[in-house]
Amino acid sequence: MLLYVCLVNLLLQSPSGVDSQVALGVIAKVGVNVAMKLISNIWKGDVVRGWKCAVENKSTKTLYALGTTPVSGHLATVLPDIPPQSTGMFVWSKSRGAARGAIGVVHYQYGNKVLNIMASIPYDWNLYGAWANARVTYQREPFSNLYYGRKGTKYPTRDGNWGKVDGTKFFLTEKSHAKFKVIFSG
């Protein structure tokens, strides 16, 4: 079995010379569990909430990075294109500031369709829980549809449970720095 891992580490510096962001693009011909181990040491500094995500592409087409829809926080790494039978990894983080969690949607182009992946990691675990969802549509799906189960979207899956929607299986852990595993079959 061919096993390859390509890691690209770029450390971006702000004009003042202080590290402002770490960008990491990863394409790996490994499963989601191995991919999670490869990026287990990403969070550093003042990240309060976040999720690291491994997307395993078991389909026959490349998943092309289409961008994000941030609600709170931002994509802290490079969003990679994911070839067939490979796994791409990225990190979403929320640093100090407003009392909000790490919340957003990542979009991948798949042929003429879009794979939308949503995670919501709360700031206050006493009031909220973590939720995840996915949907394959013909356009970028807004966060509100994925979070509230609107406009034909299945209601999201609570952390600690496997969700399955549109040929996509996913699992989100219940932690402030959550692990989000996505297995896309197409």
Swiss-Prot record:
Top-level taxon of origin: Eukaryota
Q: Which residues does UniProt assign to the signal peptide? A: 1-20
Q: Does the keyword Transit peptide apply?
A: no
Q: Name one GO cellular component term.
A: pore complex
Q: Gene3D superfamilies under this entry?
A: Cytolysin/lectin
One GO MF annotation is: toxin activity
UniProt similarity note: Belongs to the actinoporin family. HALT subfamily.
The subunit structure is: Octamer or nonamer in membranes. Monomer in the soluble state. In vitro, interacts with folate receptor alpha (of target organism).
What is the name of this protein? Hydra actinoporin-like toxin 5
Which organism does this sequence originate in?
Hydra vulgaris (Hydra)
